[in-house]
A protein has these predicted regions:
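Function-determining sites in protein domains
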Residues: 2-10, 15-140
């Protein structure tokens, strides 16, 4: 009987450790991050503003061609994200992705992170699928 209790205790510990490891290594899709976003809408768009807190009007809209918008949205859709507790304060961009609804976020390019306005969650983009390189080319 003592052996069974020891074996069950060890089994529970192993399962708990496995669960914690799996939870820690969990990455999220764009649909998870944007809370059930529908990327299959007819005319998705992306609006990009640079953020410069030294100016009176801190947002400057950047005109993005439609083809580049499609590439950015597709790259974002295919990216993978990890939740993070880091809350950056020096944002580079304010982006709104319009799908079935508008999803506004702030981005920090060098840290490859974002902050969603809808729920104030912070994410690190672990596999950006060239999102930031496309964004950099589009904003030059």
């Amino acid at each position: 009987m003592k052996k069974i209790i020891i074996i069950l205790s060890l089994l529970i510990i192993v399962v708990a450790i496995g669960f914690l490891i799996a939870k820690k290594d969990q990455s999220y899709s764009a649909t998870d991050v944007l809370e059930n976003a529908d990327f299959n809408v007819k005319n998705p768009t992306i609006t990009i503003h640079t953020v410069d807190t030294d100016k009176e009007d801190i947002y400057t809209k950047i005109e993005i061609p439609e083809e580049t918008q499609k590439k950015l949205i597709q790259a974002f859709q295919n990216a993978k994200f990890d939740k993070t507790t880091i809350n950056p304060v020096d944002y580079d961009y304010r982006i709104t992705i319009s799908l079935n609804t508008g999803y506004t976020m702030y981005l920090v390019s060098d840290k490859k992170s974002l902050n969603l306005l809808s729920n104030h969650e912070n994410y690190a983009i672990v596999n950006d699928n060239d999102f930031f390189s496309i964004l950099e080319k589009a904003t030059k």
